UniProtKB/Swiss-Prot annotation:
PROSITE patterns: CHAPERONINS_CPN60
This protein's name: Chaperonin GroEL
One GO-annotated biological process of the protein: protein refolding
Cross-referenced Pfam families: Cpn60_TCP1 (PF00118)
Gene3D superfamilies: GroEL, GroEL-like equatorial domain, TCP-1-like chaperonin intermediate domain
Amino acid sequence: MAAKDVKFGDSARKKMLVGVNVLADAVKATLGPKGRNVVLAKSFGAPTITKDGVSVAKEIELKDAFENMGAQLVKEVASKANDAAGDGTTTATVLAQAIVNEGLKAVAAGMNPMDLKRGIDKATAAIVAELKNLSKPCADSKAIAQVGTISANSDNSIGEIIAEAMEKVGKEGVITVEEGSGLENELSVVEGMQFDRGYLSPYFVNKPDTMVAELEGPLLLLVDKKISNIRELLPVLEAVAKAGRPLLIVAEDVEGEALATLVVNNMRGIVKVAAVKAPGFGDRRKAMLQDIATLTGGQVISEEIGLSLETATLEHLGNAKRVILSKENTTIIDGAGADGDIEARVKQIRAQIEETSSDYDREKLQERLAKLAGGVAVIKVGAGTEVEMKEKKARVEDALHATRAAVEEGVVPGGGVALVRALAAIADLKGDNEEQNVGIALLRRAVEAPLRQITANAGDEPSVVADKVKQGSGNFGYNAATGEYGDMIEMGILDPAKVTRSALQAAASIGGLMITTEAMVADLPEDKPAAGMPDMGGMGGMGGMM
């Protein structure tokens, strides 16, 4: 085991503070409408330019082990805020820096760190409750666009495209962000349920100009196993041919003679048919087949529930207005499922989302929910260069998280004003002793930090602006983009309440823990001996000289 270096008391805290300040100073340069960019070198490819706090924080590693511990703890603040609300990482970092700096001054003056932390926790709980009171629901498209614009660093086009996407697919709908090929941002919306499986044979194509298979008013046969024997399929095929309607088969796979027979029947026009693999794998495939069954009013033919292909009848098949199959995707439009069944299925998926602890599972469940409840919107980000594309895509993703958070918990006045207004909740708050009161006072000063930093980044005097904002009331604040004072809500400067709340909670949690640090342990750097001189090698080829 490697030897360790241990530091105690003030010498440990001073080192930690250096790391905190290095990381926070790099991150806080990006805050506000006039925040600057940070350039990150990559081990391969072009450098990345970003204004996203958590991206900057993730890149920072310091050489000194004790300083690096401080930096890593603040990085954790940014990550926690990002995980909770998807935005507000820079605000969280600025708050954490202010709490740690103020707190360590109090500890150096002889205050008890544990009581300081208790005071900070009390004040944080009161401010969080006040933020909930201050928040107003984010109901209309205009408010959603404003939140998106502010989060995307005052880029109106991003705010507007997100509001448009939410209007089209609903607030529950899935909105994905992709890299576009043009200069402008584009929005495309997929109506109905789409999954990423295409036709099993190009011979199913009936629109050769676009290479798609389109079935009007089809029946859907949903099977949770492989189909390779055509005999199993014959009863259903005959019934469908008599009904004179097209058929879409969704199964684990269709292969061999079964696929060949379907292709031949389709080409001869005996029965209009297409086949596609079921989406997903394992249990997720079963769940998605059940989703399609609910959407189309059919039943999954599964031996688990005592149904087999030979006994399947037209009653077991689903119905839809139209199905479009391309090489990569299948879209089911206007399924004939009962609204009550679809709602029950949506409720069930929502309950699973609440219970799951895995981010991956949650994302997949939300995709399933959107396919049932709304649709899927794709925002294609346009830019002039690859570097700008990456920077812009990160901003769009941030703005999307912010708007979702706003829809969830409402909005508060932006620009750091909400935190200043929430101070009213701790104006008369008292701790159990004098040192807890110092912790409460410390947080009172720290929550002004985001407002002061936004002002400093805009090139104005933080103390003057903070003073004037504190003298005002309600939504009165400072618009750093224009240098004007006024009603923040009317000026369209909104923050999601969830983002502000998560930023403060993450900062207070980790800031409080750092104040109570008394010892730090790190690996000692290994002293590697200098490499010796390489040998000269043999003097080959010089034989015969003697």
